[in-house]
A protein has these predicted regions:
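Non-heme Fe(II)-dependent double-stranded beta-helix
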Residues: 1-19, 24-132, 138
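Short, surface-exposed beta-edge/turn micro-motifs
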Residues: 19, 146-148, 216
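Short, solvent-exposed loop/turn segments at secondary-structure junctions
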Residues: 28-30, 108-113, 125, 156-158, ...
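Catalytic core of non-heme Fe(II) oxygenases with the double-stranded beta-helix
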Residues: 91, 116-191, 228-237
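A short, structural micro-pattern
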Residues: 102, 143-145, 213-215
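A structural signal for short, well-ordered beta-strand segments
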Residues: 106-108, 149-151, 219-223
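Conserved double-stranded beta-helix
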Residues: 170-204, 208-281
């Protein structure tokens, strides 16, 4: 799919009823990619000890230092706000997750040469579905609770460890296990710097090992419906000056259009806060 021809309906069809993922070519400029990569390299060069996910085997093998995360990207450069607010992606997310969808996280993942892959998994808020009894009875993917956007800053190839996924597994809504033959069935999300890979996080996937001599880095954006608790506390992390100057779209992404939870007892004036008729919100 080309950036200039993106239709929200096409993205939603691919995520819900298609393979679960779609590549949009040429979404971001070379200058945006270069600036994002510069910041990611700067903040990850000497910081191997950051929290990461789905790297239990790498931790056991003492190889976590070959995979590095950079969190709180909104506070590290305007280019990351530009990526999060990209109009074609925002339009698709409004249709997929609802008009008031939010951003749950924006981070970078850098896998160094010979860096490890991940265990096959599904993404937040489904990511601990290996404990299914912690979820409501009857939960299913007839409506989505997550969308992921991966923006490569380096080439995503089989050699560099492009994300692997098993098409159509978003309908399973379960954590992949050893008997699922993930690596025998998987395809790759190959892409070029500046592309955007949009996928439903319930689709089985994982980063693959980097067998090349170059880094493989990407910006990872998580979008959620307005009522799902975000993974990163972005509102607190970015600071008051950022919030004050935020665009209407960014305020929405930070969850400021949806005021809950709040201390309802502290509201001293009699108010009809919710409802179809004459509500304050």
């Amino acid at each position: 799919m080309e950036a200039g021809a993106v239709a929200p309906e096409g993205v939603v069809e691919a995520l819900l009823r298609g393979p679960g993922a779609v590549r949009i070519r040429g979404v971001f400029s070379a200058a945006q990619v270069a600036e994002a990569r510069r910041v990611v390299m700067e903040h990850s060069q000497d910081r191997a000890q950051t929290v990461t996910h789905f790297q239990g085997q790498a931790a056991e093998d003492q190889r976590l230092h070959l995979q590095r995360r950079v969190w709180n990207l909104l506070a590290k450069g305007d280019v990351f706000s530009e990526m999060a607010e990209q109009p074609a992606i925002v339009a698709a997310m409004r249709l997929f997750l609802g008009d008031d969808f939010i951003m749950g996280s924006i981070a970078a993942n850098r896998i160094l040469p010979d860096g490890p892959g991940q265990e096959p998994h599904i993404d937040y808020p489904y990511w601990d579905f290996h404990a299914p009894t912690t979820f409501p009875v009857g939960i299913n993917t007839s409506f989505p609770l997550n969308a992921q956007v991966t923006i490569p800053l380096d080439p995503f190839t089989a050699q560099t460890g492009a994300t692997a996924f098993v098409p159509h597994t978003q309908h399973e809504l379960r954590y992949p296990g050893e008997g699922d033959a993930f690596f025998e069935r998987c395809e790759r999300m190959e892409a070029e710097p500046g592309d955007a890979i949009v996928f439903f996080g319930a689709t089985w996937h994982c980063a693959m090992p980097n067998h090349s001599a170059q880094d493989r880095s990407a910006v990872l954006i998580q979008y959620l419906p307005k009522f799902v608790k975000p993974m990163e506390d972005l509102r607190s992390m970015v600071g008051e000056a950022f919030v004050k100057n935020a665009s209407p779209t960014m305020r929405q992404l930070l969850g400021l259009n949806f005021p809950y939870p709040q201390n309802l007892e502290a509201i001293a004036v009699a108010t009809n806060a919710e409802g179809r008729k004459n509500a304050m919100r």
